[in-house]
């Protein structure tokens, strides 16, 4: 069996066990387990210790591995850093390219729109040029026709000669030939060339048969007559030419030529087109300005409408909140202390109402029907009141309560006359309201038996004794047990008997702590002893 005192267990562990001695440890553990499970004759062999050289080699190998791992890590980190820097550069370059692309796209869009506009303008100019060419050709044709007509009329006038001296046997007439040259390209006005100015080209002779027979006889006479006729025709032609030139000059002075008229018309048409273009451009700019102004006005109107709607919604919300608050106040104002099972009443009043006292009517106070119209009302605002407000008003309550118990035998009109606050007795009576009096209280107390000088006949104690161990007046001489920290001592509003206000006649109760006002409780106890 293996024992703890055996030399195998007492041998020290070699330092190589941290690096390479794990096999020996495992062998020892396995041998221990097998010895425990198998027969007791099993023996564990000695642990083989590695040599120092092997240990050094292992250490060197480990160092090299660590160094190579550190190098690989550093290289990986550098590679990752380089990749990140390249990625950042690429992102910057892509952003710049996006910006450039946007700029180029905007410029290309502008150029395309400009080209389209120029193409449209070119088309319109071509159409205008074609239209003007057609007009120009029509005007030239009309001018040529008019000149030809004038020339024909002048030639007809010049072709009618005057021959006063003519023979009966032979009649000869010569007419000059007119040459009309129309230079369409260089000149628009025709040129008149009379051949008779230089030399006669054509001599039209009308010869009768009689003249042919008598040629030899009348040869000299014919020659003389021909010469005379030629001279007369030349004179007539010269006169006609002079008259025509003077008439043309007068016409040119009086009215311009049709060519000038056509040029003036073209200039006027161009001016008209320029003016129309200017007017259209001005209208376009005005339309753009008006559209922008209309858009701004519409936006302003929309904003004003939205603001008005928001204001109306706010007013509606405020009015709804006010109406809800008024509705709640009206609902709370309809609640009285004569109905103890209402959930909206304070807890201390419901406890007092259910456990402490039962109200009853008393002499000298108002009737139950009148009290029913003047129930004590707690608005929601009266339950939230600071202690400073109570400090400010508790002296007035004490003074008024003392004055009332000194003058308790007076009637309701004298006790409520003026602006005096009612006493604690009237408070407790108003708390009852004469509506929820129990039959026991109505049977025990009556108006004939009760008197203001005996507080025991009241049928319920004042609210000061809420939470006390005694039954109210019987324990007035002893100290009060301060079990409850809140009592129903009231702070009342001043009101008039003239009924100037409808809702201000009802007194308001405020919660008061007994721990804050011990002196006030003592004063009230003294008042109850009267």
Curated annotation (Swiss-Prot):
User: So what does this one do?
Assistant: Probable transcriptional regulator.
What is the name attached to this protein's record? Probable basic-leucine zipper transcription factor L
Family assignment from sequence similarity: Belongs to the bZIP family.
Q: Where is this region: Basic motif?
A: 56-77
> Segment Leucine-zipper: which positions?
83-104
What is the annotated localization of this protein? Nucleus
Region span, Disordered: 1-76, 142-177, 216-258, 389-481
MF terms (GO), sorted A to Z: DNA-binding transcription factor activity, RNA polymerase II-specific; RNA polymerase II cis-regulatory region sequence-specific DNA binding
InterPro entries membership: ATF_bZIP_TF, bZIP, bZIP_sf
């Amino acid at each position: 069996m293996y024992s703890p005192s055996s030399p195998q267990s007492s041998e020290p562990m070699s330092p190589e066990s941290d690096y390479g001695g794990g096999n020996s440890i495992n062998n020892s553990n396995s041998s221990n387990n097998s010895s425990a499970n198998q027969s007791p004759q099993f023996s564990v062999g000695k642990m083989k210790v590695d040599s120092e050289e092997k240990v050094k080699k292992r250490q060197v190998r480990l160092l090299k591995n660590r160094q190579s791992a550190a190098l690989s890590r550093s290289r990986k980190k550098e590679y990752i850093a380089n990749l990140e820097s390249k990625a950042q550069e690429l992102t910057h370059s892509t952003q710049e390219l996006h910006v450039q692309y946007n700029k180029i796209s905007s410029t290309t869009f502008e150029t395309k729109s400009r080209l389209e506009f120029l193409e449209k303008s070119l088309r319109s100019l071509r159409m205008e040029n074609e239209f003007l060419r057609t007009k120009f050709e029509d005007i030239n044709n009309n001018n040529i026709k008019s000149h030809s007509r004038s020339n024909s009329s002048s030639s007809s006038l010049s072709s009618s000669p005057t021959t006063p001296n003519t023979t009966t046997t032979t009649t000869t007439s010569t007419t000059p030939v007119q040459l009309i040259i129309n230079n369409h390209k260089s000149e628009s006005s025709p040129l008149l060339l009379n051949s008779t100015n230089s030399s006669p080209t054509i001599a039209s002779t009308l010869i009768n048969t009689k003249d042919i027979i008598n040629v030899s006889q009348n040869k000299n006479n014919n020659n003389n007559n021909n010469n005379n006729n030629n001279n007369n025709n030349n004179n007539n032609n010269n006169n006609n030419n002079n008259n025509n030139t003077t008439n043309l000059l007068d016409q040119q002075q009086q009215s311009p030529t049709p060519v000038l008229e056509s040029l003036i018309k073209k200039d006027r048409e161009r001016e008209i087109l320029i003016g129309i273009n200017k007017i259209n451009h001005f209208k376009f700019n005005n339309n753009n300005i008006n559209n922008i102004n209309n858009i701004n006005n519409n936006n302003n109107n929309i904003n004003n409408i939205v603001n008005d709607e928001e204001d109306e919604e706010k007013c509606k919300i405020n009015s709804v909140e006010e109406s809800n608050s008024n509705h709640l106040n009206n609902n709370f104002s309809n609640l009285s202390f004569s109905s103890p099972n209402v959930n909206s009443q304070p807890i201390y009043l419901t406890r007092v109402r259910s456990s402490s006292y039962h109200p009853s009517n008393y002499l000298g106070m108002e009737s139950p029907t009148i009290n029913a119209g003047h129930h004590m009302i707690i608005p929601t605002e009266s339950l939230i009141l600071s202690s400073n407000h109570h400090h400010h008003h508790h002296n007035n309550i004490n003074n008024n309560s003392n004055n009332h118990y000194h003058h308790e035998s007076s009637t309701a009109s004298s006790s409520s006359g003026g602006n005096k606050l009612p006493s604690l007795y009237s408070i407790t009576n108003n708390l009852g309201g004469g509506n929820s009096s129990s039959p026991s209280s109505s049977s025990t107390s009556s108006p004939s038996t009760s008197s203001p000088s005996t507080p025991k006949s009241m049928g319920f104690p004042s609210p000061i004794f809420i939470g006390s161990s005694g039954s109210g007046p019987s324990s007035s001489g002893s100290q009060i047990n301060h079990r409850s920290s809140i009592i129903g001592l009231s702070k009342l509003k001043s009101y008039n008997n003239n009924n100037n206000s409808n809702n201000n006649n009802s007194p308001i109760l405020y919660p008061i702590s007994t721990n804050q006002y011990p002196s006030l409780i003592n004063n009230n106890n003294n008042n109850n002893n009267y």
